[in-house]
Design a protein with these regions (language model features):
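Intrinsically disordered, low-complexity Ser/Thr/Pro/Gly-rich regulatory segments
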Residues: 1-158
Length: 158
C-alpha cells in the first residue's frame, strides 16, 4: 500500500475524530486472518480493515474502507472504475465485494470483534462503508450493497 493511501486513511481517521470526538478509533490496517490482528481459524482472504471504530453511545462498530482515487473521467476510466469497485470478472476481488465479505464475516463473528475491542458483550451493530477521496460517477450509475461516500459526506454515516 502506497504512502498516499496511508495518508488518506489518516485524513479519514482525523475527520472521524473531528466529527465525533467520543468515537473510539480501535485501529487501522487491521488484518483479519489466522494469527492476524483479528484472529480467525484460517486465512479467509478478507484482507484488512482500513479503520475500525466504535461508538459506545450508539453501540455501533464501524468497518471503514478508505480509497484514494483519481480516475473515472472518460468512458474507459468509468468502465475501469466500475470493474475495480463493483464488477470484476469473478465478482470476488472487486473492492465492494471484498468489503461486503468482510462485513458479513464481522456480522457472523461478533465475538471476535468484541474480543478485539475488549467490549463486555456483543450488543452492537456493525456498519460498513467506503470513503473515497473524490466523488466518482459510479455512485450515480449503480447501486451497491455497501455505501460509498466522499470525505465531505462522512458526517451522514456517523
Amino acid at each position: 500500500i502506497n504512502q498516499l493511501s496511508h495518508d488518506f486513511v489518516d485524513i479519514v481517521q482525523n475527520r472521524i475524530s473531528e466529527l465525533n470526538p467520543d468515537m473510539i478509533i480501535a485501529g487501522t490496517d487491521l488484518v483479519i486472518n489466522k494469527n492476524g490482528d483479528i484472529d480467525t481459524l484460517c486465512d479467509l482472504g478478507l484482507g484488512d480493515i482500513d479503520i475500525l471504530a466504535y461508538d459506545n453511545n450508539r453501540k455501533i462498530v464501524y468497518s471503514i474502507e478508505c480509497k484514494r482515487i483519481n480516475f473515472g473521467r472518460t468512458p474507459t476510466e468509468i468502465r475501469n472504475e466500475r470493474e475495480r469497485f463493483i464488477r470484476d470478472s469473478r465478482n470476488q476481488s472487486s473492492w465492494i465485494s471484498k468489503h461486503l465479505r468482510r462485513h458479513q464475516w464481522m456480522s457472523y463473528n461478533k465475538e471476535a470483534i468484541r474480543s478485539y475491542l475488549e467490549l463486555e458483550d456483543t450488543d452492537f451493530t456493525i456498519q460498513s462503508f467506503v470513503v473515497v477521496s473524490e466523488d466518482i460517477a459510479l455512485r450515480y450509475l449503480e447501486s451497491t450493497d455497501i455505501s460509498i461516500v466522499t470525505l465531505d459526506e462522512l458526517t451522514t454515516m456517523l
